[in-house]
Amino acid sequence: MIRSIIALMLSFALVPFAFASDRLTVKHHEIDIRVAIPLVADFCGRSVVLGPSIQGVVSLDFDDVPCSQAFDLLLESNHLLSSMVGDVLVITAMDQVLNSERKADDLRTFRRDLFNANDIERRVINIVHASASEVVSLFKESFMSLDAPGMSMTVDERTNSVFAALPSSFFPALESVIQAIDVPVRQVAIEANVVEASVDWSKRLGLNWGGALSLGNWSAVTAGDLSVAAGSSIGFGFLSNTLSLDGLFTAMENEGNGRVVSRPTLLTLDRQSASVLRGTELPYQQSAGDGATSVAFKHAALSLEVKPVISPDNSIVIEVLVSRDSPNFSNAIDGVPPIDTNRLVTTIRVPHGQTVVLGGVYSTINQQGSSRVSGISRIPGIGRLFKKKEHVTEQYELLIFLTPRILGLEVEPEKQSLVFDESFFLGDLF
């Protein structure tokens, strides 16, 4: 065999003129076809890949034959087919191609025999909770690889119904898919208490971000420090009991240590966002050209956006976005105040019924006032001794309490070991 290959290669080497004229002259008896094809292809300037089923021997006897004709005759006489893939010829045995086509015909016949048109059943199925389009898409991907004449699934978006024309044997699978995904989406109610409290009051409560949390006998541990801009120091923690939040806020307001800004309850579906916005638009004048002016507005608001995801253990993962934009009149330019922005974006896991508290967004309020003793303060000369002007600068912290609850869940909120003692808390601090 090796001698035959060497002899064939030498026969090609002895016809250098063939490269210029693109004609082939070669004569050889019984050489392995897997050797002959690449040699002829190389002489003709072609790249080939041989299929694994190609085998046998071939005799070559070409006398000044065009190269392309010689190559085609070599393939045809040995029942081989070629197909171009890019710049490469893929050579395949004709029997292999015929077998593949025969298998495809057999599969088509099998489908026709399996799903005769008379076996097609037609039904209208109403989808209650899920999207009919999603049901059809999922079923087609999973179960309808055996397509057949007469089979179809269409959707009526108006009634959220599926019109199915399928073999009877397919409907149990379709019903199982519908039963699995056509379920009501659970709802989550998130009670939010947005509080603006003095920093002194927060310190009296023992609120310390970035470590342990304690409000009297309230107790929690923060989930970790957050990376925020310098000067923000935003943090969060969990409270073990929420039964006396109302009393806590009432005492705060009665002592003048803060106020409840907003108390919204956001109701949303699992994996759906909900938001609340409270703010104002600040008017200012701007040039409109040709010396004219127009009134424009800057938006300053407190916004809260949440997206709950219910976990299998009935805890709730919440994506939280808190944003507070407030005007900074002390740095106003031509009467137009810049907008100071504080923003917190985080994801936290909260057990059903427990409270997470977010804080660390600060603002400063400057207050000026005066007091005097009636009558005496009006006496010239000595009256000024009975007057007093006051300038108070106080820093406030924005605290946001979030309590998520899964609607319809009968499980009691998880309790921690330390329980809030209202009498001790109010007696010591207020």
From Swiss-Prot:
It comes from the Viruses. It is a single-pass type I membrane protein. The chain crosses the membrane at residues 226-245. It is found in: Host membrane. Residues 1-20 form the signal peptide. Coiled coil: none annotated. Keywords: Host membrane, Membrane, Signal, Transmembrane, Transmembrane helix. Its main location: host cell. May play a role in phage assembly. This is Putative assembly protein ORF430. It comes from Pseudomonas phage Pf3 (Bacteriophage Pf3).
